[in-house]
């Protein structure tokens, strides 16, 4: 089981794009949260966190690289649970 955190500028459809990337990598989202805050420049920033079970072994770097390709993603953090 993995915990994935994605920090990005907020926009419509962001959670759907993140979910699609995870599904394409054979991941099942167990739980997730998405919060929107403002940064120091008053930009809306989304903080998406999900606990994921991958059906097949998945390299953290591959998952991170695919998530970073999403428009306006600033940071991806992956940790084991």
Q: Where on the chain are the PLM-derived regions?
A:
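A conserved regulatory-domain signal marking ACT and ACT-like small-molecule sensing domains
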Residues: 1-81
